[in-house]
Amino acid sequence: PWGTFILASTFEDDKTAAETHYDAVWLRDSLWGYMALVSDQGNSVAAKKVLLTLWDYMSTPDQIKRMQDVISNPKRLDGIPGQMNAVHIRFDSNSPVMADVQEEGKPQLWNHKQNDALGLYLDLLIQAIDTGTINAEDWEKGDRLKSIALLVAYLDKANFYIMEDSGAWEEDARLNTSSVALVT
């Protein structure tokens, strides 16, 4: 329903899509798509739509609650349960409210600790503000400004520079220099 995202993949059959969840909207993949669009001036309107919709996703009540919970208690990120307490990096492409990917009626367990995606998001958002692509009217909508401030505080409280995450390759949790670099 969004029309402003690039799905990781599309499938002819719903069963394959449901098994892989590559039909979800992924923050990182959408940001790379945004970068491709913004590099072509003829696609600047589409690029801005992608970035604003991602900003809206990061400003949803669920995302804001995750950030606030970690700011209040960074230990919520500890261990495997902490993977679901992290800011989420993907959502169901068919959800009108950007809800989690579901399995059997519950959010699918996933390692959402992917600070590289969060760092890339902040970097591109700041660049768009700096260039005037995003203006005051854009950032005043809803909880967008609040979500930026909370995300910065979340990364600080999470000690991103020593936090193990699954990184860009979504591998086992470890300290990834690519994640640390993108946040800094």
Model-assigned labels for residue ranges:
Residues 1-184:
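Acidic, mature catalytic/reactive cores of soluble proteins
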